[in-house]
Amino acid sequence: MSEPRKILVTSALPYANGSIHLGHMLEYIQTDMWVRFQKMRGNQAIYVCADDAHGSAIMLRAEREGITSEQLIDAVRAEHMGDFADFLVDFDNYHSTHSEENRELSSAIYLKLREAGHIDTRPVTQYFDPDKQMFLADRFIKGTCPKCGTADQYGDNCEACGATYAPTELKDPKSAISGATPVLKESLHYFFKLPDFEAMLKQWTRSGALQESVANKLAEWLDSGLQQWDISRDAPYFGFEIPDAPGKYFYVWLDAPIGYMASFRNLCARRPELDFDAFWGKDSGAELYHFIGKDIVNFHALFWPAMLEGAGYRKPTALNVHGYLTVNGQKMSKSRGTFVKARTYLDHLDPEYLRYYYASKLGRGVEDLDLNLEDFVQKVNSDLVGKVVNIASRCAGFIHKGNAGVLVGADPAPELLAAFREAAPGIAEAYEARDFNRAMREIMALADRANAWIAEQAPWALAKQEGQQDKVQAVCGLGINLFRQLVIFLKPVLPKLAAAAEAFLNVAPLTWADHQTLLANHQLNPFQPLMTRIEPAKVEAMIEASKEDLAAAAASQPAGNGELVKEPIAAEIDFDAFAAVDLRIALIEKCEFVEGADKLLRLSLDIGDAKRNVFSGIKSAYPDPSALEGRLTLYVANLAPRKMKFGVSEGMVLAAGPGGEEIYLLSPDSGAKPGQRVK
């Protein structure tokens, strides 16, 4: 028998500035299922995580709420831990990056990098808010795009035209925090010399540690040459002060991944059998896996392994990267009620419904996953209630009535039982590869075969026939054993159902190896319902409650929504100036990603009697570009064409919103036609 594997697993650290939602839960459920599978196989799998608890955003929110940053992160951490526990995510340790372990490790790693010559310093000129007396990160500066003239754009890129620029290039810059006009001020910054590790990273990213599509994307960065990474922020800042640099703090993305190490070290202090260096040392034979979303690949696949290499630690065995969550084919929306918080879901529905649905859709790739709510109801009701639980509910009553609850050891269908046993290695292989959807398909195919066989044997009919009691018990006994096999295969996904099934079966917690054995002449406990069907009305109630969450949040704000404060109405223009802008209705015929562009989508537009090609910086809000195809939008037709490195953009489509995921492409009422002028 082979030695148990030593495996350390992490999920990305949720930011301690807001609630967990169903998009977040995709990653934690995925990770938890994989870790539970490893533990069932007898491996030493350890799952650690923590709240990402540093940064200006946390400091500013705490200030607005009149509490300390420590009070804020403690409250958010408690909320996060409650949500995860109720979703059956079983961390071995859940810590915080604002911890002594993380302070010590961050300082030690920095000092090792400095000693090895991988730290540089140089003055940086950046915007400073004179009212708040703080330097402003790019996202805290708003102004007019220097390229296309669109107002209310962030300090590093324009969501309208996709241009990137330095914050100092913005026209009419304003602090997004105070509204003050920022001033330029020089400050000494600390940099990590990422280019020192370029050769290592080129080799490591092609070593099999990454999915191929992720490695290909990173190759673009590596081929264009790496830049030094700014790892410092100036006071005031909520975080750890850099050693020997008063008033300078580690940038949150330096100490956040070190939080993985800190959480594990915190666990080691409570579990003496665990050796920190055995998992993190340069020559560690343990496996280390990070489950992350595709939006934070650069930090984990470039900066993080370079930091570990430079400080004398081991690198990850692999990064397991997943895509985004959409709901009903579109990005999560607060107004539609599909931006669902974890707690709102839990108030209405069983967490195992979602765990199973995610498992049925998750593959090993980085494709986005769509939570289609109608399909969700149908799949859970059909697969879990109609197939798996149905086997036990069909058979248990006959065993209790006809044999005092004792399951006999007969095997009336050896070929069927053999099929279940022979399927186990393939299902295990799918779990190991994170092909959860394949595992679920194979498990449900077995459930179909079991149900078909039981229906064919019809124990309910046999029970009415004289002298058929032995056959009834044999059929139902095998039915319960097949149900037990399915429970073993589903246990990583459905731990609560498995625990209830174990109680009914009157057995110790099931391991993966138990699929090789059968129950025989075994006393069962009385059967209790294991799972109920999803009621569509409860899904609707969850959606309505999510809309109410939005309304409550809006009601707690001051009168008005603050948009005019953030972006005051521009200087008055005359009608001729407005009339000079030729706005048209455009039909989006095709919408696609732009290779090599992080923020742009390419839109092919029909404007009635002509076609136009437009690049728009709306990718972050529309992870599925095809969802925009066939939609009407507003188009600036007489904007001068702009040559970009990806091609020529012939105009601009109009959108509202602050940016990021909150970009809303404008559409006319139904009945408008491509080419019509907007007046």
From Swiss-Prot:
Q: Which HAMAP family match?
A: Met_tRNA_synth_type1
Give the GO molecular function terms. Answer: ATP binding; metal ion binding; methionine-tRNA ligase activity; tRNA binding
Q: What does this protein do?
A: Is required not only for elongation of protein synthesis but also for the initiation of all mRNA translation through initiator tRNA(fMet) aminoacylation.
Q: Which taxonomic lineage does the organism of this UniProt entry have?
A: Bacteria, Pseudomonadati, Pseudomonadota, Gammaproteobacteria, Pseudomonadales
Q: What is this protein called?
A: Methionine--tRNA ligase
Q: Which residues bind Zn(2+)?
A: 145, 148, 158, 161
Listed CDD domains: Anticodon_Ia_Met, MetRS_core, tRNA_bind_EcMetRS_like
Supply the InterPro entries for this chain. aa-tRNA-synth_I_CS, Anticodon_Met, Met-tRNA-synth_bsu_C, Met-tRNA_ligase_1, Met-tRNA_synth, Methionyl/Leucyl_tRNA_Synth, MetRS_core, MetRS_Zn
Q: Which family does it belong to?
A: Belongs to the class-I aminoacyl-tRNA synthetase family. MetG type 1 subfamily.
Return the broad EC class. Answer: ligase
PROSITE patterns, A to Z? AA_TRNA_LIGASE_I, TRBD
